[in-house]
Amino acid sequence: MTALFPFDNSFARLPDRFFARVAPTAVEAPRLVRLNRTLALDLGLDPDRLESPEGLDVLSGRRVAEGAEPLAAAYAGHQFGQFVPQLGDGRAILLGEVVGRDGRRRDIQLKGSGPTPFSRRGDGRAALGPVLREYLVSEAMHALGIPTTRALAAVTTGEPVIRETVLPGAVLTRVASSHIRVGSFQFFAARGDVEGLRALADHAIARHDPEAAEAENPYRALLEGVIRRQAELVARWLGIGFIHGVMNTDNMSIAGETIDYGPCAFLDAYDPATAFSSIDRHGRYAYGNQPRIALWNLTRLAEALLPLLSEDETKAVAEAEAALTGFAGLFEAAYHGLLNRKLGLTTMRDGDPALAGDLLKTMAENGADFTLTFRRLSAAAPGSGPAPEPEAVEAVRSLFIDPTSFDAWAERWRRRLDEEPGSAAGRKALMRSVNPAFIPRNHRVEAMIEAAVERQDFVPFETLLTVLSRPYDDQPDFAQFAEAPEGGGRGYRTFCGT
């Protein structure tokens, strides 16, 4: 019989100081909540075997699969601006890597699988609520077209975990292009371990930026690749109203994937100062701050890479600064290009950033819902065909406390659309493809978690997962899931769940 996971491991070949070899801790009575059968097939796995007792034992950590080399990775990181020289996987264990049907290499990691040498007096376990949140939101992000880690399985353990209260335990099987973080490089830089730093950088180049190996300065090319991916990723976050909530350097993947969903949330009423995380007391990681924080984190990566950029410190700093100066242009191009598409614009004119910015300003002043405003604009967009239905225009106006403020902006928008090529139908299709009808509304996510944790009712989880798998379709039978919460979601708080 073939192996359950056809592991082909590369990170485990690195020197021992990169990780601690540790096996998952067995649990008493695991039960499969959800297997992502589609993802399993994409990875070349057999979903039926994964759902069998054999598969459940591996997905819960009761048994180590054939070919697995379980380990907890070492890394450091800046947490809310303060450097911590040793963090590491405190409740996650990398089982190994598989190469999917598309030829891409992915990590298979268990979260909540027990203590590791990096647990820092923690129990290494995860509660059911955070596991379901990450499963649901990461899969929703994938459906929205945002680069992200994925969820292969969620399993309850049959054991309690002690947090503020006693909660049911769970294990998430996470799939990622890798788990190399900015903090991974900081770990070696902080120790003056240049050879370890070089080995990690060479591994990262081979895995994520193979073309960088041929560059004049491969390590600068690696840095530039990470900068580009992060600039594009954060622009896409802003485009759907996503707030990560804890953008520490140990939570920034060099693969350019969204990772670590602990206190994440989505905008309801548009306000760039929105920060939902209970531990983000000063709004460091607020929605509108995310591009600035991304650059701050990337600057920390550049600092860590200085010994590799050049043996001459002055030249190394110049190389790092030259790479970092590219972030602003990359982000602005990605962000304003996305905003233009959200407004039905396929060409870029000098006044377009101001047009989009003025809409956002008007939305903030009027408490307009971010997702509903852009989705309803899709139906209200004028064009060379028939005028939009009055009901479609009124549906947008009704989102603004002062509808006349929207009217003034909409007139400018209509004049700008008159300059665009293409048909009204094509414009509407474009807008609908980038303006989702459905996002993981915070109040819906909380209701789903409450049902599962308090009543062992997983129907809301399954329903929400189904709806969010088609975020750009209207789905009239599930229209209630597109609705904004009362009060625009103000006062909502998220918690890390560790």
From Swiss-Prot:
This is Protein nucleotidyltransferase YdiU. The active site is at 250 (proton acceptor). Keywords: ATP-binding, Magnesium, Manganese, Metal-binding, Nucleotide-binding, Nucleotidyltransferase, Transferase. It comes from Methylorubrum populi (strain ATCC BAA-705 / NCIMB 13946 / BJ001). The gene is ydiU. Transmembrane segments: none annotated. GO terms for molecular function: AMPylase activity; ATP binding; magnesium ion binding. Its EC number is 2.7.7.-, 2.7.7.108. It is an enzyme of class 2 (transferase). The keyword Transcription does not apply. It comes from the Bacteria. Its cofactor is Mg(2+); Mn(2+). Nucleotidyltransferase involved in the post-translational modification of proteins. It can catalyze the addition of adenosine monophosphate (AMP) or uridine monophosphate (UMP) to a protein, resulting in modifications known as AMPylation and UMPylation. Signal peptide: none annotated. It catalyses: L-seryl-[protein] + ATP = 3-O-(5'-adenylyl)-L-seryl-[protein] + diphosphate; L-threonyl-[protein] + ATP = 3-O-(5'-adenylyl)-L-threonyl-[protein] + diphosphate; L-tyrosyl-[protein] + ATP = O-(5'-adenylyl)-L-tyrosyl-[protein] + diphosphate; L-histidyl-[protein] + UTP = N(tele)-(5'-uridylyl)-L-histidyl-[protein] + diphosphate. It holds the Pfam family SelO. Belongs to the SELO family. Mg(2+) binds at residues 251, 260. ATP binds at residues 88, 90-91, 111, 123-124, 174, 181, 260.
